[in-house]
Amino acid sequence: MSQEKLKSKLDQAKGGAKEGFGKITGDKELEAKGFIEKTIAKGKELADDAKDAVEGAVDAVKEKLK
């Protein structure tokens, strides 16, 4: 797992924990912040996955052109 993907997973977990704690305590602001952090981290993970897929496709094309 890449460093970026690991960081995204950890950030998702932290955001989810904040969101859950906010729900339990009734702290709507903390709940919202946690949700936002979790969502941003998931977006970063998806972007990293897309980058990896594009790099893999480019490498495959380069191999075929050799």
Curated annotation (Swiss-Prot):
TM region positions: none
Cystine residue pairs: none
InterPro entries noted in UniProt: CsbD, YjbJ_sf
Pfam families: CsbD
Region of interest (Disordered), ranges: 1-22
Family the UniProt entry places it in: Belongs to the UPF0337 (CsbD) family.
Protein's name according to its UniProt entry: UPF0337 protein SAG0619
